[in-house]
């Protein structure tokens, strides 16, 4: 969830108005700075963007020339590019996001493709006591047909026990994290070392 300081910053930014010669996407303008809740403590919000449909088409017509001659309008050209897997023109547009998400989701997200990421640093700052705990309907067994996927939903005592373990382990790990970095009566462990004990379901931001 957003802090009061972040909410105040969002309101201040949304009140600002500026003129520009850049291409403006009306659809994207409606999302600027708005935080959309994700999972139990997470969110996604658009901070900035560059380009629109016209930027994609402009790049495609420069790159492919005669290959796009039969396509008369931008919508048709974009469909043509997607259908034939011409992906580079789409990279002429960028979206700058502010995301709060569990660490294990963050690692899975960016392992598939190189990205420009400026992540909240646990070397310099203290992480919040916020962990992703799945809703009961998302607690599932390992799939017997897909090694990367989930199977049937766990129910009854097993589901309750699993959730209690997840909550207890998260709380205990954070308690130990706080104790290690505390300078009350001790020097306190360096933050870059203390963070190694935190579980992958703790929330980060980028």
What are these regions (language model features)?
Residues 1-206:
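Family-specific signature for flavin-dependent thymidylate synthase
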